[in-house]
Amino acid sequence: MNTFSQVWVFSDTPSRLPELMNGAQALANQINTFVLNDADGAQAIQLGANHVWKLSGKPDERMIEDYAGVMADTIRQHGADGLVLLPNTRRGKLLAAKLGYRLKAAVSNDASTVSVQDGKATVKHMVYGGLAIGEERIATPYAVLTISSGTFDAAQPDASRTGETHTVEWQAPAVAITRTATQARQSNSVDLDKARLVVSVGRGIGSKENIALAEQLCKAIGAELACSRPVAENEKWMEHERYVGISNLMLKPELYLAVGISGQIQHMVGANASQTIFAINKDKNAPIFQYADYGIVGDAVKILPALTAALAR
């Protein structure tokens, strides 16, 4: 048996749902999708869900992860085994841990390849900071996986598809984190997974203010703006959702223009599938040039305005 009887899918990020659904179609006979609203439910059916389970009734101050209890109960009620697919977002990994505990299931994060043999999942993902690929065969009846972006192609919606919709009512967990305040995200929504052209900045850009130079280039060529992990996590110059690398975005654009990025393996794992890599770095010995199809050795702060002017013509 090279498929599971059932797969359960949930994505806190709508843009990641199509690829998870495509993976679900390849890995199981019946697809169940947890959703948060009717619009997501309709989308899930068009993407191939046989059953949609609408999570309902959560108080505003509670976190989405607090649905883990009723999600696990629903999964157990409909089969003694199964596969759970989640995106490798922060929330996806938090939910994976909670579901793994409740289902007594093995959890594997950042999966880049998933296959099924004899009813058991085999998962490959990067280990040792991207220096090697580890393979795990999951022996527990339930398997909970968080999937790296780009692992599966996006499923295409089909408006003629039909499916059944059910409601899963909120049940307060015995122990939970309560949200006491929220802060609106300052950036516009970003969908880097689908971008044809990506301009990505590293700490070599020099300062947060200099990122505006990369933004101007993006406007000139119709590209999306991304960054390296240090820019997002250490310097806090850009949002977490934009960083490319082993533990976040894995991109496959037509062009990846790396600006001031050294090219460490942990970053390049997320960019090396690009059709063309163009690097700008003032260090001629930077590892990025080993991956680049084209490169310019020089100061990005001086090069970007000239490049933008030339490409905007």
From Swiss-Prot:
Membrane listed as a keyword: no
Binding site for FAD: 255-283
Disulphides: none
InterPro entries linked to this entry: DHS-like_NAD/FAD-binding_dom (IPR029035), ETF_a/b_N (IPR014730), ETF_a/FixB (IPR001308), ETF_asu_C (IPR014731), ETF_asu_C_CS (IPR018206), FixB (IPR023461), Rossmann-like_a/b/a_fold (IPR014729)
Gene3D superfamilies from the UniProt entry: HUPs, TPP-binding domain
Coiled-coil stretches noted in the UniProt entry, renumbered to this chain: none
GO molecular function: electron transfer activity; flavin adenine dinucleotide binding
GO terms, biological process: carnitine metabolic process; fatty acid beta-oxidation using acyl-CoA dehydrogenase
Pathway: Amine and polyamine metabolism; carnitine metabolism
Keywords: Electron transport, FAD, Flavoprotein, Transport
Keyword Membrane set for record: no
One Pfam family recorded for the sequence: ETF
Similarity comment: Belongs to the ETF alpha-subunit/FixB family.
NCBIfam families registered for this protein in UniProt: PRK03363.1
UniProt cross-references to HAMAP family, sorted A to Z: FixB
Subunit note: Heterodimer of FixA and FixB.
Function: Required for anaerobic carnitine reduction. May bring reductant to CaiA.
Name of this protein: Protein FixB
Organism: Escherichia coli (strain SMS-3-5 / SECEC)
Gene that this polypeptide is encoded by: fixB
